[in-house]
Amino acid sequence: MTTETGIPEVVKASSETMSADGKPEKPNPSMFPKRQKRDTPKEYSYLRCEYKLPHKNHRQCHMQRKAEEKFCAQHVLLQKDSYAGRERVVCPVDPGHTVWADELQQHMYKCNKVKERMQKEREGWHRDDMNISNPEAKPCVGKKSDITVDYAKWIPVVEAAFKDVEEVPVEILNHEKGLAKRMTEVQNKKHALQQASLIAHMEKTGLLKSSSRILEFGAGRAELSRYINYAICAERQQDDKTAANYLFIDRAMPRMKMDGKLVKDTKDDFPEQPLPLIKRLKMDIKDLMLDGVPVEGPYDANLIVSKHLCGCATDLTLQCLLNSAVFTKEARPAALVIALCCRQICNVQMFPKAGIEWLQERGFDDDGFAALTRMTSWVLCGERPKKEPVEGEQTEAADNETPAPVGHPSGLPAEARKVIGLKCRRLLDQGRLHALRKEGLDARLVQYTEMDISPENVCLIVNK
């Protein structure tokens, strides 16, 4: 029903409702009933596979099935081994799907995994496992529980070896020009503060400039490179017309990438400057032959960066650089600034060989290395701090609270385990330093931010 003005009566009535002080009142929710849930399931215009996907919370498969079958071609093997005399077999290239046995030969020409493999073979920068430094080493199998680690044996070894570890100085810096805009855009400044310090450390290397090639390993969305680009633009001289050169490397292709933001920021805030040149590689660092990657434009230095590159990826990156001309044969200067992370997933097969030897000299065999990586997680194993009560806010009864776990297999309280975990971190980092210095590189560690900003607050800096 509508009024003479054409406004629905319900809406007009709600818009004319005023409170005692003359301000309009919010409309009554009962006047706008919620949309009712569908009583019957959604109907599909095709015969849908009846298989419930266990890894998708038992959601029904969306593939089409034949009228005489319950399942689609992918799941028909769950009902019987063959259909009309035809047998389905697992694809030899990708075990994640099946094909008809009599169509296997044709399938090998159109399988997506086969196409990916052929594409990699055509690329000049892909070599399977070339950056795994210790392929002959015994791989770590699965995740070890705390009970399987002999703490009585390995904690004293950690304490004794820690005497050879260098102190990590605190160097918290700030890059005001490059991150000034960023600081005003975010309410939670934790990431911005870390980025500002890392970029300032890059500037100290002397290679934060438009003529450097910026290589971000484990780039993800390339958020760090976005603000590196902004910092370079903010510091650029007026007569500098060199286009900045970026290479992003990640084995995933994340959504909401910021590659375009680098170009947009330059257009909007620095319209007189040349637009950056960007190339993104989707590949695993373990297979990357860096010297084979084509360069987008001229450059006179290499700056390798990453923020919180996980343990295995850090070691693969270091080996990738040592296998390339960047840190060995090239005359161009090079520097590396990486915020370290996730040492609990370091692997003896990927850790620098000279670093493994350094640890072995201090009593860590393969089991000791596994124990070392396991105990690094103790840095974050302390009890979660209790939330401070807010005035006027109800708090749960004490008898409803879940008590913190007690009786850790190591026999140590949380604070003592945290100290041991930090020492294990430093031992792994010292092994990396030893390996890099053995190659003639200038390598050091710094605490680039406070631990309450990020528990992973150590940065590896390398200069050629």
Swiss-Prot record:
Pfam family, one: zf-U11-48K
Principal cellular location given in the protein's record: cytoplasm
EC number(s) from the headed UniProt entry: 2.1.1.225
Organism for this UniProt entry: Yarrowia lipolytica (strain CLIB 122 / E 150) (Yeast)
Function summary: tRNA methylase which 2'-O-methylates cytidine(4) in tRNA(Pro) and tRNA(Gly)(GCC), and adenosine(4) in tRNA(His).
Residues reported to bind Zn(2+): C91, H97, H107, C111
CHHC U11-48K-type zinc finger segments: 88-115
Catalytic activity: cytidine(4) in tRNA(Pro) + S-adenosyl-L-methionine = 2'-O-methylcytidine(4) in tRNA(Pro) + S-adenosyl-L-homocysteine + H(+); cytidine(4) in tRNA(Gly)(GCC) + S-adenosyl-L-methionine = 2'-O-methylcytidine(4) in tRNA(Gly)(GCC) + S-adenosyl-L-homocysteine + H(+); adenosine(4) in tRNA(His) + S-adenosyl-L-methionine = 2'-O-methyladenosine(4) in tRNA(His) + S-adenosyl-L-homocysteine + H(+)
Coiled-coil residue spans: none
Cellular compartments annotated: Cytoplasm; Nucleus, Nucleolus
GO cellular component: cytoplasm; nucleolus
Protein name: tRNA:m(4)X modification enzyme TRM13
Broad enzyme group: transferase
Family in the record: Belongs to the methyltransferase TRM13 family.
Encoding gene (name): TRM13
InterPro entries listed in its UniProt record: Methyltransferase_TRM13 (IPR007871), Trm13 (IPR039044), TRM13/UPF0224_CHHC_Znf_dom (IPR022776), Znf_CCCH-type_TRM13 (IPR021721)
PANTHER family: TRNA:M(4)X MODIFICATION ENZYME TRM13 HOMOLOG
GO biological process, one term: tRNA methylation
A GO MF term: tRNA methyltransferase activity
Keyword Ubl conjugation: no
Alphabetically ordered keywords of this record: Cytoplasm, Metal-binding, Methyltransferase, Nucleus, S-adenosyl-L-methionine, Transferase, tRNA processing, Zinc, Zinc-finger
Keyword Lyase carried by entry: no
